[in-house]
Amino acid sequence: ADAPPPAFNQCKACHSIDAGKNGVGPSLSGAYGRKVGLAPNYKYSPAHLASGMTIDDAMLTKYLANPKETIPGNKMGAAFGGLKNPADVAAVIAYLKTVK
């Protein structure tokens, strides 16, 4: 993976980039490009599982800025208000594309 942008510090409070290492949130290893809810051994909220979304630029642009509104009832939205700077959102998305 590339070096994480400063905005990722907010993400790593709950998420690991190591495969199979879940924290409060699921591991982000290989997350970009797959359907939500597929990190092994992580208990997702029913709202997340029902969303059917794919983790891509369009989804992340909305979700990272406002997780509560993008997937109502999800756990992340209850704890994290979102990244307010669009440049931070773009930097985190670019980084997640490199996290295998």
From Swiss-Prot:
Heme c binds at residues 11, 14-15, 76. It comes from the Bacteria. Pfam families: Cytochrom_C. GO terms for molecular function: electron transfer activity; heme binding; metal ion binding. SUPFAM superfamilies: Cytochrome c. Keywords: Electron transport, Heme, Iron, Metal-binding, Photosynthesis, Transport. GO terms for biological process: photosynthesis. Gene3D superfamilies: Cytochrome c-like domain. InterPro entries: Cyt_c-like_dom (IPR009056), Cyt_c-like_dom_sf (IPR036909), Cyt_c_1A/1B (IPR002327). Binds 1 heme c group covalently per subunit. Belongs to the cytochrome c family. Cytochrome c2 is found mainly in purple, non-sulfur, photosynthetic bacteria where it functions as the electron donor to the oxidized bacteriochlorophyll in the photophosphorylation pathway. However, it may also have a role in the respiratory chain and is found in some non-photosynthetic bacteria. This is Cytochrome c2 iso-1.
